[in-house]
A protein has these predicted regions:
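Charged/polar interaction segments and conserved charged motifs
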Residues: 1-2, 57
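Short terminal alpha-helical segments
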Residues: 2-49, 96, 114-121
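General structural signal for secondary-structure boundaries
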Residues: 20, 59-62, 74, 93, ...
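Amphipathic alpha-helical interaction modules
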Residues: 25-80
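Amphipathic alpha-helical binding modules
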Residues: 77-122
Length: 122
């Protein structure tokens, strides 16, 4: 089951041409997906979350991302290690500005929707 933010990011990925923009959107989608998976009503298990973070680190490391986005995603991954809904909400709110600066307003709007939803779950 996907969230409105995930759906919007997947649509943006599908509409973008190959290149750094598409890879940035894909990386953002991966992080948003990992963060939203920590939120109630059905958060993932700690073991599953650790696996997701390991896969996330491997996948993001292989992408050609603009430096500001790469730094933001690395920081987000570190915050997600605590595996709490509060960490997920923090990560989503902190990703809005880098998403807007690097990927555009539509990507930032998708992250903003996810951040608002996360705050409602706290």
């Amino acid at each position: 089951m996907s969230t409105p933010a995930e759906d919007k990011l997947v649509t943006l990925i599908a509409d973008s041409a190959r290149g750094p923009q598409r890879e940035g959107l894909f990386a953002l989608w991966l992080v948003v997906r990992a963060a939203e998976a920590l939120l109630p009503p059905a958060p993932v298990s700690a073991k599953n979350h650790r696996r997701r973070l390991q896969a996330l680190e491997t996948r993001i490391g292989s992408l050609a991302l603009p430096a500001p986005l790469k730094r933001a995603l690395a920081a987000a991954r570190q915050h997600l290690e605590t595996a709490t809904p509060n960490a997920a909400a923090l990560v989503l709110s902190q990703l809005t500005a880098p998403a807007r600066d690097v990927l555009g307003v539509e990507a930032a709007d998708a992250v903003t929707v996810a951040a608002r939803s996360a705050r409602l779950h706290l």
